[in-house]
């Protein structure tokens, strides 16, 4: 069990806001002619560019939040672990750490170490709008 707070990151590699958005993803997709890792299927790109995020966008920012940073301690094997808020609500899935977190198995530094989680609303959006998995969406009550 690990606990922490969602927050920005400022370290040797610069400053990062605590969440990423669809425009930041589309900016990377725009570079896909130079960087293969940024390529997406044309239908996925069209879906993202459409910008109809409905119930999945963040109520405060109005943005589709994709991933977020926390100061949770994460280690190998944690990928896919659920991330809950203080109310016990699922908010995301842990999947990685920032570069400065790579040494956290030896020395955890709360100021530099960040866990990267995918926002569960983005996961549900992809399941719903791209995967058309209506039965799954109904099963989780959306």
Give each language-model segment a name.
Residues 1-77, 84-142:
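Serine endopeptidase catalytic core focused on the charge-relay Asp
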């Amino acid at each position: 069990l690990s606990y922490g707070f969602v927050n920005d990151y400022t370290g040797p590699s610069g400053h990062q806001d605590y969440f990423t958005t669809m425009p930041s993803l589309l900016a990377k997709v725009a570079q896909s002619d130079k960087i293969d890792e940024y390529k997406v299927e044309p239908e996925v790109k069209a879906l993202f560019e459409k910008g109809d995020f409905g119930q999945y966008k963040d109520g405060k920012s109005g943005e589709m939040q994709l991933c977020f940073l926390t100061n949770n301690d994460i280690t190998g094997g944690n990928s896919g672990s659920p991330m809950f808020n203080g109310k016990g609500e699922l908010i995301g899935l842990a999947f990685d750490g920032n570069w400065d977190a790579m040494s956290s198995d030896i020395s955890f530094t709360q100021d530099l170490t960040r866990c990267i989680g995918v926002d569960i609303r983005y996961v549900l959006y992809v399941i719903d709008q791209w995967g058309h998995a209506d039965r799954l969406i109904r099963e989780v009550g959306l």
